[in-house]
């Protein structure tokens, strides 16, 4: 009888503690972390927490099959690191550049269109994950790509040595 009473008391205390504490929430990213380049002219924008969350979800849905961890499975020499994006032609190290790429992808040097082999809005009939993405969705994905180096550091795009 005493054991049963102790068990009930312990269970009651633990359940009461759960109600008082509530569920755990993710650490909110500060404004500096959420500030990313908007365009090649140097303007910046601050992503909302909703955009950050949605960007991660959409990236995992539409992009992570080939770009998990910021690498490119089909070409290990070019990833989604800030350096790789900045050296592309046109510069893709900003929201507008990445959104343009997601609409109409080109080779790293910008010379040839590759929409038939890279998912994009232009090739949504082939790559169905891109079908229903809006411009806001593309901006959220671009924002996710641009804040990852600030969150995970050199692991983003680091390749096999990290994963």
Swiss-Prot record:
The keyword Iron-sulfur does not apply. Binds 1 heme c group covalently per subunit. Its main location: membrane. One of its GO terms (biological process) is photosynthesis, light reaction. Its cofactor is heme c. One of its GO terms (cellular component) is plasma membrane-derived thylakoid membrane. Keywords: Electron transport, Heme, Iron, Membrane, Metal-binding, Photosynthesis, Photosystem II, Signal, Thylakoid, Transport. Heme c binds at residues 63, 66-67, 118. One of its GO terms (molecular function) is heme binding. Belongs to the cytochrome c family. PsbV subfamily. HAMAP family: PSII_Cyt550. One of the extrinsic, lumenal subunits of photosystem II (PSII). PSII is a light-driven water plastoquinone oxidoreductase, using light energy to abstract electrons from H(2)O, generating a proton gradient subsequently used for ATP formation. The extrinsic proteins stabilize the structure of photosystem II oxygen-evolving complex (OEC), the ion environment of oxygen evolution and protect the OEC against heat-induced inactivation. Low-potential cytochrome c that plays a role in the OEC of PSII. This is Photosystem II extrinsic protein V. It comes from Nostoc punctiforme (strain ATCC 29133 / PCC 73102).
